Amino acid sequence: MLKLSSDERRSLRARAHGLNPVVAIAENGLTASVVNEIDVNLKAHELIKVRVFNDDRDEREALLASICELLDAAPVQHIGKLLVVWRPAPADA
């Protein structure tokens, strides 16, 4: 999982403000296809929002940590049912 400084996190939160969620996680949770879709969107956009249809805050926190671990990304923000995730574009892109 990537680590961000508070200044980097603040800048990314500002950039993410106008974004719409590109992936939704429903009752099936973090399936392989959902992880793949998040990966595809991170490659395309670097910074994405993910909507989680789950009322348990602790489970949403765990989902954010799992996403970041699996995809070597950085958690930017968790507000309500929205997760903001960032991963820098590959150097060869």
Predicted regions: what they are:
Residues 1-93:
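Positively charged, polar, low-complexity stretches
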